């Protein structure tokens, strides 16, 4: 009987329940609750469910005491040196193998490949000036970098230059880009930045309208824009090729993101590779999304997530997103003045690369002022320009701080 009781005690002591009673064990419980809350947002509120659901579940898995789902000590350093490979291959598990795709920068470009197969650049081609709105919205990224450096200077928090740059990229409202930059510059902040980036992407309809209305007048919001011209198939085919060449020559570090985005779009527009275009936009993208979100979720351990830095990252992420929206709207107002009132400033807010949510918000706010107004296609120009802009901004940050 004594042996039986000792066996039961031994089983309990080796279980995860016993570890909740250890010093700091309550942190695991907090992280599990955070994961469950994100699952609630994904399932009930439908906030970016394709990403948040596997990410939140990965967060729960990684914070179950004793589970040993991922071993982040194998990934210390800037690259994967020979001893790390040996440790990962011999002692690593599923999450370790999947995380190698994040560490090596494989998943985000493949996500961009899938995005490219679903992106329509015709509104941008027919109105090239909308590229400026997409570029203007990226000012939020660089403004937030300065904000992070200012916070560090005041002593409130200690962010390095690389960490500040990784946080700033949240302002691009592009999850894969944020993960790509963070994995290169500040992998220790990957979980916090990924959660913030995708949360704010889901909150586009909540965050943007108050900023848009505060910076524009009723007259400006009521502007009806002329119908866009029809774009030929030749233009749609040449565009991704030329963008890849020009952007890669100007910002070589953006070549992999922009190149994969444009390859996906070329597959879509050329019309001769339907089979691989559908695979890249459906099966491949779905598989990579699962791998990416699950592995990123597994990096959110209690000791790296539950600290004041995460709180500042969330605040700075909101500032970055708000700055990007405001910069786009203000540049839209400038174009409104220069065009003699022919450009609706609301389309400037779509310069952040949350496709197509930001464009839909421009449409909704515009129709609330003028029910006969249809801004969606006009807003899609800055929206897809924002995707290119965020990739270019990522390349610039990696070039400077990488």
How should each PLM-predicted stretch be described?
Residues 61, 99-125, 264-267, 285-307:
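Hydrophobic transmembrane alpha-helices of secondary-active transporters
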Residues 1-23, 29, 75-87, 91, ...:
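Intrinsically disordered, low-complexity non-transmembrane regions of multi-pass membrane transporters
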Residues 244-328:
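Transmembrane helical segments that form the transport core of multi-pass membrane transport proteins
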């Amino acid at each position: 009987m004594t042996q039986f009781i000792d066996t039961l005690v031994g089983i309990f002591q080796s279980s995860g329940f016993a570890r909740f009673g250890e010093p700091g064990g309550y942190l695991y419980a907090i992280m599990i609750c955070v994961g469950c809350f994100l699952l609630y947002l994904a399932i009930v509120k439908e906030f970016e469910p394709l990403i948040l659901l596997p990410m939140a579940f990965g967060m729960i898995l990684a914070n179950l005491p004793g589970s040993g789902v991922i071993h982040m000590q194998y990934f210390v350093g800037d690259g994967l040196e020979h001893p790390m490979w040996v440790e990962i291959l011999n002692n690593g598990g599923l999450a370790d193998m999947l995380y190698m795709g994040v560490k090596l920068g494989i998943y985000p470009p493949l996500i961009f490949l899938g995005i490219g197969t679903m992106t329509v650049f015709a509104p941008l081609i027919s109105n090239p000036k909308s590229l400026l709105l997409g570029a203007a919205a990226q000012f939020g990224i660089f403004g937030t970098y300065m904000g992070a450096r200012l916070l560090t200077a005041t002593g409130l928090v200690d962010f390095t230059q690389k960490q500040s740059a990784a946080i700033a990229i949240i302002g691009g409202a592009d999850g894969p880009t944020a993960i790509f930059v963070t994995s290169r510059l500040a992998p220790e902040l990957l979980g916090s930045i990924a959660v913030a980036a995708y949360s704010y992407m889901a909150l586009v309809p909540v965050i943007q309208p108050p900023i848009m209305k505060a910076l524009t007048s009723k007259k400006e919001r009521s502007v009806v824009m002329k119908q866009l011209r029809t774009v030929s198939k030749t233009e749609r085919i040449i565009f991704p090729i030329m963008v890849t060449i020009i952007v890669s020559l100007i910002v070589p570090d953006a070549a992999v993101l922009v190149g994969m985005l444009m390859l996906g779009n070329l597959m879509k527009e050329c019309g001769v590779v339907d089979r691989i275009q559908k695979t890249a936009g459906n099966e491949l993208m779905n598989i990579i999304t699962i791998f990416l979100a699950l592995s990123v979720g597994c990096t959110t351990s209690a000791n790296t997530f539950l600290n004041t830095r995460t709180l500042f990252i969330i605040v700075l992420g909101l500032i970055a997103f708000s700055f990007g929206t405001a910069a786009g709207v203000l540049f839209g107002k400038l174009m409104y003045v220069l065009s003699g009132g022919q450009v609706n400033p609301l389309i400037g807010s779509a310069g952040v690369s949350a496709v197509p949510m930001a464009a839909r918000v421009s449409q909704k706010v515009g129709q609330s002022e003028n029910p006969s107004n249809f801004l969606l296609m006009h807003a899609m120009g800055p929206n897809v320009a924002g995707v290119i802009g965020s990739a270019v901004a990522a390349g610039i940050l990696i070039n400077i701080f990488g």
